[in-house]
């Protein structure tokens, strides 16, 4: 056996015996390092005659290549073994009982729960859920909704505007979920015109909205839900019935008295604010009884300008819409004193006010059972 064959055999045995990456690195340095055994062999090529170099060069370089390949294979094998050992060590037995702790149980956030409750109620009435982008254009957020030029909501101190683009146009974080109404009406109008299929619109729109406001009852990011009905026969009586049914179901009372007060919103005409009967004498508000009134939402008939901007003839179609703050009605229903706590990610708070994951709201089983 030649010296090169003996050296190769020894190095390959050392590689096979290496039990971890530090050991394989030590073998590499001993063989291919600056003073390694293979490196020393390579250095001798410089002192050989051309004939000797031609004979010995391929053998020595072949040795180097085989050692390098063996080192790479062993290193890969060791890494796979390490990963397999770690997976085995950290394996979780999913059949074990869950540890009873706040972190392991988990809770559904009240906002998510209330959104599920609201959508369950309106789904039972035949409404579908619609969504839209949080970043909107001035047109969809204001102009198409009949906000006049110079309206306070268009000012920088009320609305989060982005920097203008190269065309001088500014986008913004939507200040309400109402732009989704326009998007939806445009889509339905396009289907009507293209396919000659005139379907009524019945949608409910939950989502995040943004305004420059922050205190115990206001947040710069908050949640709204609104609804829209557009049909040839939609009227105020329909709207009143829908809202009464919603309030009874949401607050889980057999009956509720509603008071409708004239108001003003740019996108509805007439516009109304709705109060419901309640008792505020105790620590928590009780709905469906008492002598107090509490404002709960705003609503109205869709303004003709909004219908027109969305592709509907106001002489043929009517619509009604309503909207409310999800955070606020969650606070009212479940007795939460400070809106800011909704966004603090405090595990103790969510443990107290949160809901079990299997508390899925249904009208049959009770929304907050």
Swiss-Prot record:
Complex and partners: Tetramer of two alpha and two beta subunits.
GO terms (BP aspect): phenylalanyl-tRNA aminoacylation
Alphabetized HAMAP family for the sequence: Phe_tRNA_synth_alpha1
Protein family per UniProt: Belongs to the class-II aminoacyl-tRNA synthetase family. Phe-tRNA synthetase alpha subunit type 1 subfamily.
Top-rank lineage group of the source organism: Bacteria
Required cofactor names: Mg(2+)
InterPro entries: aa-tRNA-synth_II, aa-tRNA-synth_II/BPL/LPL, Phe-tRNA-synth_IIc_asu, Phe-tRNA_ligase_II_N, Phe_tRNA_ligase_alpha1_bac, Phenylalanyl-tRNA_Synthase, tRNA-bd_arm
Coiled coil (residue ranges): none
UniProt-recorded name of the protein: Phenylalanine--tRNA ligase alpha subunit
Chief location of this protein within or outside the cell: cytoplasm
Cofactor binding annotation: Binds 2 magnesium ions per tetramer.
One annotated GO molecular function: magnesium ion binding
Reactions accelerated catalytically: tRNA(Phe) + L-phenylalanine + ATP = L-phenylalanyl-tRNA(Phe) + AMP + diphosphate + H(+)
Amino acids binding Mg(2+): 269
GO cellular component: cytoplasm
Alphabetically ordered keywords of this record: Aminoacyl-tRNA synthetase, ATP-binding, Cytoplasm, Ligase, Magnesium, Metal-binding, Nucleotide-binding, Protein biosynthesis
Gene responsible for this protein: pheS
EC number(s) given by UniProt: 6.1.1.20
Gene3D superfamilies, per the entry: Bira Bifunctional Protein, Domain 2
Cellular compartments annotated: Cytoplasm
Pfam families given in the database record: Phe_tRNA-synt_N, tRNA-synt_2d
């Amino acid at each position: 056996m030649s010296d090169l064959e003996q050296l190769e055999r020894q190095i390959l045995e050392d590689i096979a015996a290496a039990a971890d990456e530090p050991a394989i690195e030590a073998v590499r340095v001993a063989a291919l390092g600056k003073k390694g055994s293979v490196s020393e062999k390579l250095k001798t090529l410089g002192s050989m005659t051309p004939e000797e170099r031609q004979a010995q060069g391929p053998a020595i370089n072949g040795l180097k290549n085989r050692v390098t390949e063996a080192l790479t294979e062993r290193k890969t094998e060791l890494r796979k073994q390490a990963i397999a050992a770690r997976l085995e060590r950290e394996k979780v037995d999913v059949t074990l009982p869950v540890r009873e702790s706040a972190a392991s149980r988990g809770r559904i956030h009240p906002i998510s729960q209330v959104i599920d409750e609201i959508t369950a109620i309106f789904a039972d009435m035949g409404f579908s859920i619609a969504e839209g982008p949080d970043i909107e254009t001035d047109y969809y957020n204001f102009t198409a909704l009949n906000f006049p030029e110079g309206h306070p909501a268009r000012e920088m101190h009320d609305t989060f505007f982005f920097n203008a683009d190269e065309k001088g146009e500014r986008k913004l974080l939507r200040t309400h979920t109402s732009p989704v109404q326009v998007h939806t009406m445009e889509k339905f109008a396009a289907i009507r015109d293209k396919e000659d299929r005139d379907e009524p619109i019945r949608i409910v729109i939950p989502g995040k909205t943004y305004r420059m406001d922050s205190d115990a009852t206001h947040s710069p990011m908050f949640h709204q839900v609104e609804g829209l009905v557009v049909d040839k026969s939609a009227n105020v009586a329909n709207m009143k019935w829908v809202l009464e049914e919603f309030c009874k179901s949401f607050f889980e009372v057999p009956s509720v008295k509603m008071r409708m007060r004239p108001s003003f919103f740019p996108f509805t005409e007439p516009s109304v604010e709705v109060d419901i009967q309640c008792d505020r004498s105790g620590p928590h508000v009780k709905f469906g009884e008492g002598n107090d009134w509490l404002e709960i939402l705003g609503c109205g008939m869709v303004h003709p300008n909004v219908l027109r901007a969305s592709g509907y003839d106001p002489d043929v179609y009517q619509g009604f819409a309503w909207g409310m703050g999800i955070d606020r009605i969650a606070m009212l229903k479940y007795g939460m004193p400070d809106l800011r706590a909704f966004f603090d990610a405090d595990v103790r708070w969510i443990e107290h006010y949160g809901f079990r994951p299997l508390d899925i709201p249904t009208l049959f089983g009770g929304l907050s059972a």
